[in-house]
Amino acid sequence: MSDFIVGLTGGIASGKSALAAEFEKLGIPVIDADVVARQVVEPGPILDAIAHRFGRAILLPDGMLDRQALRQIVFADPVQRKALEAITHPAIRAELRRAALAARGPYAIVAIPLLAEAGGRATYPWLDRILVVDIPAALQHARLMRRDGATPELANRMIAAQATRDQREAIADDIVSNDRTPEQLEQEARRLDVVYRVAASEH
């Protein structure tokens, strides 16, 4: 049981996954919001609610979610997107918390890419600490073009669609700057691991 929970977030291409992997090497369970988001729309009550709201055309013949069909509906219409989020987001948050509390370790990390956009602690009041991975804008831009093959214009749009660095840092208890070597990122994870283990033991 891990009742001390750290929220991990950062902008696109900031290195959230790399930092999460360093904590996993230290034996810390990491629950990924992207994975949970895919799990909650597997056949079951949440998918039933989505089909009821958007119609059975968003289901594949085998009863699974047709992600492309749903994506075309919600990305074209902000009202539809909010309707989908009203169904899925509470279920995702509840499952993240359940999985974190059930995890075996001195504490658990929940990786939430859009934590700042979702409202930070106001939306996730059960987070004991928030860790933000920060990256200079120029390096983030270069990584996006290299990693995703994005054009400079697309990279700019992808970054602009997310919270600003200031907005993320405003919700942070801890900030790791990921403009260094993998070895330095590992050292930062080890340093914070000590901090979190102590905090969890006193929790």
Swiss-Prot record:
Against InterPro entries, the record matches this protein to: Depp_CoAkinase, P-loop_NTPase
Which positions, given as ranges, span the membrane? none
Fetch the PROSITE patterns from UniProt.
Answer: DPCK
What does the record list as GO biological process?
coenzyme A biosynthetic process
User: Where in the cell does this protein reside?
Assistant: Cytoplasm
> Which Pfam family, just one, is annotated for this protein?
CoaE
Which GO terms label this protein's molecular function in UniProt? ATP binding; dephospho-CoA kinase activity
* Residues that coordinate or bind ATP: 13-18
- Where does it mainly reside? cytoplasm
Which EC numbers characterise this protein's activity in its record? 2.7.1.24
* Pathway(s) annotated for this protein in UniProt: Cofactor biosynthesis; coenzyme A biosynthesis; CoA from (R)-pantothenate: step 5/5
* Record's GO cellular component terms: cytoplasm
Classification via NCBIfam families: dephospho-CoA kinase
> Which purpose does this protein serve, as stated in its record?
Catalyzes the phosphorylation of the 3'-hydroxyl group of dephosphocoenzyme A to form coenzyme A.
State the family named in the UniProt similarity comment for this chain. Belongs to the CoaE family.
Q: What is this protein called?
A: Dephospho-CoA kinase
